[in-house]
Swiss-Prot record:
It catalyses: ATP + H2O = ADP + phosphate + H(+). The lineage of its organism: Bacteria, Pseudomonadati, Spirochaetota, Spirochaetia, Spirochaetales. Transmembrane segments: none annotated. The gene is ruvB. This is Holliday junction branch migration complex subunit RuvB. Its EC number is 3.6.4.-. DNA binds at residues 315, 320. Homohexamer. Forms an RuvA(8)-RuvB(12)-Holliday junction (HJ) complex. HJ DNA is sandwiched between 2 RuvA tetramers; dsDNA enters through RuvA and exits via RuvB. An RuvB hexamer assembles on each DNA strand where it exits the tetramer. Each RuvB hexamer is contacted by two RuvA subunits (via domain III) on 2 adjacent RuvB subunits; this complex drives branch migration. In the full resolvosome a probable DNA-RuvA(4)-RuvB(12)-RuvC(2) complex forms which resolves the HJ.
């Protein structure tokens, strides 16, 4: 990698050389949370109203692709409500006693955050129905003929549920959430703000053009932007520079095999498979996922939203289909699906 651009040697302060904890990059307050303005504006009203009434915030349902800040926002809500938060995920709630153990130890007006809500077991969902609506839980004491159900009161709490698959959450459970918000992919402007903010936290100097290039390659996702920011810091550090320039980012992305549209090698594998193995589609998501060594869930949750956003693939009633832009991006002839050679010859042109 050519790191000709840059200025001074890195800061010798040992704090620069050791990675900060990931949580330090997460905003602590709603005012610091970049993007998702429609969600923030509504939440600020709901939080203020709940605090003024000295009540628990209504239950909150957060959905959207991974890496957009659902968990971060849950923590921010707890801070803004001046309360505690307990964090778990649906797969960890295996038996009724698991959810009962959590609900009975909550404080009044505290928050329970459950990630991957679409993976809750039916028996856990049924217990949450009563807990969310009446703030009570039914618990069976004893066994056999002597068994009896006892209804216990629990503190008035706020359940924040997050999922990447809102359509798979049971309707009765979904209906009990009073605040429903969907996260959208971030704009480049919003990602630039996140990169600039976090570069200060990581003690990294960034050129404006470098931040824009990094934002453009971050798939509309803060988690990806933060990961790339750390890698650019590594490249600059090893190269002996404390100013990350556009050329450094460009070279770094090329080393990571991320192209000018933000696509990585697996993104291109998906497009190549769709075009070269299935003649551009349409093809079912399960078949396409198997062809690239992914699960259907990971293909739908992580890769597809961005590929659709960039206009590279489209969903049809018969399956996934490559667009004309996908052929152009891979430098493939749409009339010759076996034209793999031209794609390889044009690979460097695809990157930068």
């Amino acid at each position: 990698m050519n790191l000709e651009e840059g200025s001074k040697l890195l800061n010798s302060d040992k704090n620069f050389l050791y990675d900060r904890n990931e949580s330090e990059l997460r905003p602590k307050f709603l005012r610091d949370f970049a993007g998702q303005s429609h969600i923030k504006e509504n939440l600020s009203v709901f939080i203020k109203a709940s605090r003024d009434r000295n009540e628990a915030l209504d239950h909150v349902f957060l959905s959207g692709p991974p890496g957009l800040g659902k968990t971060t926002l849950a923590s921010i809500i707890a801070v803004e409500m001046n309360t505690t938060i307990k964090v778990t995920s649906a797969p960890a709630l295996d038996k009724p006693k698991d959810i009962v153990g959590i609900l009975t130890t909550l404080d009044d007006k505290s928050i329970l955050f459950i990630d991957e809500m679409h993976r809750l077991k039916p028996v856990i969902e049924e217990m949450l129905y009563i807990a969310m609506e009446d703030y009570k839980i039914d618990w069976i004491i004893g066994q056999g003929p002597a068994a009896r159900t006892v209804r216990m009161s629990i503190p008035k709490f706020t359940l924040i549920g997050a999922t990447t698959k809102p359509g798979k959450v049971a309707s009765p459970l979904y209906a009990r959430f009073g605040i429903v918000s969907r996260f959208e992919l971030y704009s480049e402007d919003e990602l630039v703000k996140i990169i600039q903010r976090n570069s200060i936290i990581l003690n990294v100097k960034f050129e404006d053009k470098a931040a824009w290039l990094l934002a453009k390659s971050s798939r509309g996702t803060p988690r990806v932007a933060n990961r790339l920011l750390r890698r650019m810091r590594d490249f600059a550090q090893v190269g002996g520079y404390d100013l990350i320039t556009e050329n450094i980012v460009s070279d770094g992305l090329e080393m990571l095999k991320i192209d000018h549209e933000g696509l990585d090698e697996q993104d291109r594998n998906i497009l190549r498979s769709l075009i070269l193995k299935f003649k551009g589609g349409p093809v079912g998501v399960e078949t396409l996922a198997i062809s690239v060594g992914e699960t259907a869930d990971s293909l739908e949750d992580f890769y597809e939203p961005y590929l659709i956003l960039k206009g590279l693939i489209e969903r049809t009633s018969r399956g996934r289909k490559a667009t004309d832009f996908a052929y152009c991006h891979l430098n493939l002839n749409k009339n010759n699906h076996n034209d793999l050679g031209s794609e390889q010859d044009g690979y460097q042109g695809i990157l930068f």
